[in-house]
């Protein structure tokens, strides 16, 4: 799946697709905040087309949190360590 350009976050940050009721999303946001990881949140129940995008990334399931990285790759319900490692990998690759 090709991530639409409007959902590619700037270097050093991630875009998080979430919902207001998602406990995993709240947990990950708290971890990202405490670790100083920059992110933009997009509620898939409020932004047209994003639920479909998340479903496409996740084999037909609207699973959140789904994160998009600066290289256009994604991860579903990742740990903080995974997010930090992926951001470091993207940065070292110069993306």
Each language-model region and where it sits:
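Non-catalytic, surface beta->alpha helical segment in thiol-disulfide oxidoreductase systems
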Residues: 69-95
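Structural micro-motif
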Residues: 58-67
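Thiol-based oxidoreductase modules, predominantly thioredoxin-like and allied folds used
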Residues: 37-51, 62
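Glycine-/small-residue-rich active-site loops that bind phosphorylated ligands and cofactors
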Residues: 23, 46, 74-75
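Local sequence-structure signature of Cys/Sec-based thiol-disulfide redox active-site neighborhoods
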Residues: 2-38
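Short amphipathic alpha-helix with an adjacent loop that forms part of the alpha/beta core around
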Residues: 52-58, 86-90
């Amino acid at each position: 799946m090709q991530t639409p350009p409007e959902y590619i976050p700037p270097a050093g940050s991630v875009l998080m697709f979430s919902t207001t009721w998602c406990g995993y999303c709240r947990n990950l946001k708290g971890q990202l905040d405490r670790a100083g990881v920059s992110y933009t949140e997009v509620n898939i129940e409020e932004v047209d087309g994003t639920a479909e995008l998340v479903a496409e990334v996740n084999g037909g399931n609207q699973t959140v949190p789904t994160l998009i990285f600066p290289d256009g790759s994604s991860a579903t319900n990742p740990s903080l360590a995974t997010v930090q490692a992926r951001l470091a990998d993207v940065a070292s690759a110069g993306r």
